[in-house]
Amino acid sequence: IAFSARYNWWRIPQSYKKTRVLMYHSISEHIGKEKHNKWRVKPEDFEKQMNWFYKNNWKSFTISQLVKLDKIPEKSFVITFDDGFEDNFTNAFPILQKYNFKATIYLVPNQKINHWEEKNTSVLSNLLNNEQILQMQNSGLIEFGSHTLSHVNLSTISDEQLLNELKESKKEVENIIKKECEAFAYPYGKFDEKIVGFV
């Protein structure tokens, strides 16, 4: 689980009434000692994690489903994937189907401009194509949200650029999924009161 060592929620007794949010990026094998391995979870490990939630009778929701609930049930959890890597389809999706678990994937529609991967010498993987996105959505298990237009740190750009990143990314995602885009994730987890207001 991405950043699991940082949060350590499994070491501190927590009420089952609290929803767990599992945040992933790439579900793929590690490559040597490559620095981007921190963003990768091996398919075998992802399978074990999903199996644990399944055997312990946890119920998955998409983000938009969860926020609409009047009362959140015990043992509820959300699975999210940032950036929309192709291995979310090839490696994660079959496992989610096996356990009938739902997930939210946050897309970066503009794959040619400023995607954070392109700034590094190693690319984690390709991104999802439209056909894969629609196949996942049509399964009824996967929801797609926006992760801005170009994966930019929203705290470093002008208000005009910020508004463009939000509006255009929402529009682009909706052009692909043919329905309203209801979910959003902040790139790098960077946001403040002003950015939240714009969102």
PLM region descriptions:
Residues 87-88, 154:
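Secondary-structure boundary/capping motif
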Residues 91-95, 194-198:
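A short acidic, amphipathic alpha-helical/loop segment
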Residues 43, 47, 86, 159-164:
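Non-membrane alpha-helical structural segments and their capping/turn regions in soluble enzymes
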Residues 2-77:
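N-terminal pre-catalytic segment of deacetylase/amide-hydrolase enzymes
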Residues 82-83:
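Noncatalytic alpha-helical scaffolds and linker/capping helices
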Residues 43, 47, 89-90, 127-130, ...:
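Structural motif corresponding to alpha-helix initiation and N-cap regions
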Residues 22-29, 39, 75-77, 97-192:
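Metal-dependent polysaccharide deacetylase catalytic core of the NodB/CE4 family, i.e.
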